[in-house]
Amino acid sequence: MISHIPINKIKSVIIGDGLVFRPHKNTLKDLASGEMATLNNVATQLLLYLLQNGKEISSRDEILLNVFQHNGARATDANLNQHISFLRKAITSTGHPAELIVTIPRMGFRMGDANINIILLEDCYSLFLIVFV
């Protein structure tokens, strides 16, 4: 869970076995193959939100309020479903499993069981690695 880390301090998040998420570049990239997927701003914010909550379930209403409305996007179930699908396709296009994002029926979504490593950029000079299991 990364909720205590300011988003503007996150350089990269390594999800699972080498999927690199760079929020400021709106990209997902596989470390081994170099396969890259570009995300739109709402998808980037959605993935950040899910990462912030880790394995805790994020309800649809929470996501619609904190991601979609907060970013001026249409806050509808259909739009949320489209963005979850878009994220899963982006993840699989880099060779990683779509199950990195888990649907909890009638409840919401959460991150899967993958390890999450966060690389922080402090003052543009030094990098820190924090590992969450």
What residue ranges belong to the model's regions?
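N-terminal/domain-start alpha-helical segments
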Residues: M1, Y125-V133
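Short boundary/linker motifs that mark transitions into or out of structured domains
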Residues: M1-N40
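A short linear beta-strand->loop->alpha-helix hinge motif most characteristic
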Residues: H4-S12, P97-Y125
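Short amphipathic alpha-helical recognition elements used for nucleic-acid or partner binding
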Residues: M36-V67, L87
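DNA-recognition element of transcription regulators
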Residues: L39-L47, A73-T92, M107
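Short helix-coil junctions and helix-kink-helix linkers
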Residues: N66-R74
